[in-house]
Curated annotation (Swiss-Prot):
This is Small ribosomal subunit protein bS16. Belongs to the bacterial ribosomal protein bS16 family. Signal peptide: none annotated. Gene3D superfamilies: 3.30.1320.10. The lineage of its organism: Bacteria, Pseudomonadati, Pseudomonadota, Gammaproteobacteria, Oceanospirillales. Keywords: Ribonucleoprotein, Ribosomal protein. The keyword Transmembrane helix does not apply.
Length: 79
């Protein structure tokens, strides 16, 4: 099954997450099909906290991709 979930990046104590479209059998930070956005939980000031390519996200959802609970909440917050 194709899922849209977060993949952790960044460095120690400074997390940064990519919103990835991936096969659910792949590792969390492993192979992915497409990157559709990012989430920066440590953003301050004018830094961008979240960016989502809504057009591509909708494309994958229409084709049956399932969003994780956290991604669903982030997409609602960014809208």
């Amino acid at each position: 099954m194709v899922t849209i979930r977060l993949a952790r990046g960044g460095s120690k104590k400074r997390p940064f997450y990519h919103l990835n479209v991936t096969d659910s059998r792949n590792a969390r930070d492993g192979r992915f099909i497409e990157r559709v956005g990012f989430f920066n939980p440590t953003a301050r000031g004018n830094d961008e906290r979240i960016r989502v390519d809504a057009e591509r996200l909708q494309f994958w959802v229409e084709r049956g991709a399932q969003m994780s609970d956290r991604v669903r909440d982030l997409v609602k917050a960014s809208a």
